[in-house]
Amino acid sequence: MHMPPDPTDDPILASDPPLDQGLWAALAPESWPVPLWMLPPGTALVGGAVRDGLLGRLGERPDLDLVVTGDGLALTQEWAQRLGGTAVTLDRERSIGRLVLDGWTLDVARQQGGSLEADLHRRDYTINAIAWLLPLDAAPGALVDPLHGLEDLRDGVLRAIAEANLLDDPLRLLRGPRLAAELGCTIAPQSWEWIVTHRARLKTVAGERVLAELMRLVRGAEGARGVELLRRGGLLEAWTAGPATSGPSRPATAHLTLEEARRRGFTDTEANAALPMARLAALLDEHALGAMHASKALRRRCRHVRRWRQRLMALGLIEQGFGALPEDEQLDLHNQLGEDLPALLLELPPSVARAALSRWRDLDDPLFHPQSPMDGLALQRHLGLSPGPRLGSLLAYLMAERAFGRLPRDPRLDSQTLRVARGWLADKGDPCHD
C-alpha cells in the first residue's frame, strides 16, 4: 500500500502560452496508443486528463476519457481488433467501453444529451466538466467550458454542478473530499452542504467502489486532509454503524502526514508505505471493510493496527510506546503487525518512534522480527519430539526467550538453546531424549 509520487510540472493555468497550446503540449496526443486520425469527428477528451493537464499533474500515461457521438463500446472493440490490446465493456446500456493497450487506459463513452455541452452538464464537479474538442489534424484542439470550470480551477474551488448530479451516482459525494484533498481545493459551501446532507446515500453504492475511492484518498499526498473531511462530514457513518470497537476509535489525524512521518525518522519510501494503512485504520474497522468486500489480508492488517493503537491509548502508553507493555503483549504486537508496525509508530512521539523504527529496520532484531532460535525440525531431531501443540508451545517459548535477550541472537549457538529447551520440557513434566 503505497502513495504515488507528486507531479512536478508547472500548471498551464499560470503559464504564458495560450491554454490550448499548453494543453496540447502537456497531453502529447502524438504518444497516445490511438492516433488522432482514428478518432471520429466530434470526439472530445473530458474529465481528469484535461483537469490534470491544466494543473500540471499528468503522469506518463494518464487515463484518457473520450466522449464520442457514436457507439463508444463498438469503437473500443474496433480499436482492439486493429491496434491490439483488450476491449472491456463498462456499461452496455450507456455504450461505455475501455481499451487497455501498452500501459494506457482509454474509456470511450457515447455522448449523453444532444450536444457536448449537455453531456458536460451531467457531470459531477465543474473542474471535471472541461472538455478538449480534439482535432483531426496536428493542431491544438478547442477547450469547451460551459460551467466555468477553468475559473474554479484558478480559484482552487471544488463546486458541484447540481445537487441532482451528485445523487445520480452517490459515489460522487465521496469523490468530492478526495478531489479537494488531492488538488488542494476548497469545497464550495453549497456543495459541502449537499455532500453532508446526502451522505447516507453512500450506503447504496457498491462496497467495492466505495473502497476503491477510499484507497485513492488514503494514498494521496494530502490524504490526512481527506480523512479529516470525511470524518468532519460523517460521510462514512452508514458504513461504520456495525459492532462498536473497544477503546478510542476516532484518533486525531494531523500526525498522518509526510511531514510528521519525517519528524519521526521515516524515509519518504517508508512513509509512503505506512501512511495509507494508518489513515485507513483511522477511518474504518474490520466490520466496515468486510461490508466493502475488502480482502481478508487488508481486513486483518487494519484490525491489528487499530487493535494495538487502541490498546496503547486505553493504557495511557502512547507517550511511552509499546516497550511498556508486558512481554507477552509486546511479542504478540510484533508478530501481528510485522510490516505494518510503522503505521503504529506514526501514533507515537517522535523520539519514541525514531528508536523503534531503527530497531524495526534491523531484520535481525529478535523482538521486532521474532523467530525461534531453532526450527521445529531441529527440535524434533535433537529432542525426540513429535509435531503437535507441545512442539508449538516450545517454539513460542524459545522465541520469547530470544526476543528478550535470555537466549543469544546468534542462531548457531544451538547448545544453549537445547539446554533451555530441555529445562522447559522438564518443568512441563515432559521427558526428552537425544
Predicted features by range, described:
Residues 1-434:
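Catalytic cores of the polymerase beta-like nucleotidyltransferase superfamily
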